[in-house]
């Protein structure tokens, strides 16, 4: 019998989950209410977890698996005719003006290559070579170049996944889903006046998940952080599509996309009242101050837009996923934070397998959903 699965939330995680389920032959309904501030909608992803100094091994295992998962997924999407995936393996420059820090970075990359060959070539570049690859940079920065790194446009990838899922008979509905229950089983969802039944419901609702779970008496402890991300256009270049991603020694990043687009960001705003999607003067100032410090060549760029998204986090900054305790038929995943585009597609494949009762490739104890529920 074909298993009916409803996925609530069509960000990178929900879209990836639905895509995998549809490919595996499930009967899939995706419901999304298109809230402003979806993290995926705003996000520009850097797929380069190998240089991270985060000491949390459970986080690194997921991020590494996420990066490894991408090339196969993109190849699959392309074979289905999806050419606009927003993904390109353009390499990354991790820049610093302190040569000792460059030494440490190079050392870290080489150590991690042992169990992550997808990192590609690791090359140390001096100042001139660094600026040749990304001409807008300030003088004085050396870099470590990682050839296996990639960049992805969250919105483009999500749309490609959803189109492909729909070609495999998944149905996408706009609307506000309300969970339907009978005793301790979640049986489906209501959207407006319609009700849809399913064997499994998967909640991938990011910063809004708690609203969905509260009627069941679940307090899903997911906080969110506001990100403002700025898009600029270079006036005089032929194309910037093959420029590497730039990772400065801060919480900022610089990405070049096709058609002379440069994306810089992002803010990390924690004390947000409600879902405040406004672009603020202070947010823009922070992005520009930091961006121009690393890349003064941005000064002559044309301002295009600022996108705003809410990154969901758990208390220990680790994703959580699994069957929701006390309720049959309900699975949830959340808390991908700033790593959503790195981990989302891989975690979607794991959620799909979980929903269909197939073995998964990660130890769920590391990401136990009970940690985020009381």
Residue ranges of each PLM-predicted region?
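N-terminal Rossmann-like FAD-binding beta1-loop-alpha1 element of flavoenzymes
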Residues: 3-29
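Short hydrophobic core segments
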Residues: 6-8, 196-208, 348
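Active-site substrate-recognition segment that forms the wall
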Residues: 16-24, 33, 45-46, 82-88, ...
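Short loop/edge segments at beta-strand edges and connector loops
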Residues: 32, 126, 174-176, 305-307
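Dinucleotide-binding Rossmann-like beta1-alpha1 core, especially the glycine-rich loop
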Residues: 46-133, 290
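Short beta-strand to alpha-helix junction loop
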Residues: 61-64, 98-102, 144-160, 278-282, ...
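Helical element adjacent to the flavin cofactor pocket in flavoenzyme catalytic cores
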Residues: 144-192, 196
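C-terminal catalytic lobe of FAD-dependent flavoproteins
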Residues: 297-374
């Amino acid at each position: 019998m074909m298993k009916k699965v409803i996925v609530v939330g069509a960000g990178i995680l929900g879209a990836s989950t639905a895509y995998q389920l549809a490919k595996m032959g499930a009967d899939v309904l995706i419901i999304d209410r298109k809230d402003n501030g979806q993290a995926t909608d705003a996000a520009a992803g850097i797929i380069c977890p190998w240089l991270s100094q985060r000491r949390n091994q459970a986080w690194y295992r997921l991020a590494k698996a996420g990066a490894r998962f991408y090339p196969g997924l993109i190849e699959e999407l392309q074979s289905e005719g999806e050419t606009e995936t927003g993904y390109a393996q353009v390499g990354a420059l991790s820049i610093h003006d302190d040569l000792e820090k460059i030494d440490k970075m190079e050392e870290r990359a080489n150590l991690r290559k042992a169990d992550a060959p997808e990192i590609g070539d690791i090359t140390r570049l001096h100042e001139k070579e660094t600026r040749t690859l990304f001409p807008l940079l300030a003088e004085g920065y050396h870099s470590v170049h990682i050839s296996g790194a990639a960049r992805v446009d969250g919105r483009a990838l999500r749309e490609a996944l959803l189109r492909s899922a729909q070609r495999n008979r998944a149905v996408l509905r706009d609307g506000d889903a309300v969970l339907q229950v009978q005793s301790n089983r979640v049986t489906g969802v209501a959207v407006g006046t319609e009700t849809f039944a399913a064997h499994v419901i998967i909640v991938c609702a990011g910063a809004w998940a708690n609203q969905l779970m509260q009627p069941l008496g679940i307090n899903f402890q997911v906080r969110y952080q506001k990100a403002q991300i700025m898009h600029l256009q270079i006036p005089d270049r032929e194309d910037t599509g093959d420029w590497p991603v730039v990772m400065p020694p801060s919480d900022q990043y610089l990405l070049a996309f096709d058609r002379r687009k440069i994306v810089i960001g992002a803010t990390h705003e924690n004390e947000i009242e409600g879902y405040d999607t406004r672009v603020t003067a202070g947010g823009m100032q922070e992005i520009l101050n930091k961006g121009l410090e690393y890349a003064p060549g941005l000064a002559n760029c044309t301002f295009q837009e600022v996108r705003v998204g809410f990154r969901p986090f758990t208390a220990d900054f680790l994703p959580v996923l699994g069957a929701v305790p006390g309720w049959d038929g309900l699975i949830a995943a959340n808390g991908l934070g700033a790593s959503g585009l790195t981990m989302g597609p891989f975690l979607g494949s794991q959620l799909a397998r979980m929903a269909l009762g197939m073995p998964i490739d990660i130890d769920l104890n590391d990401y136990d959903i009970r940690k985020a529920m009381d």
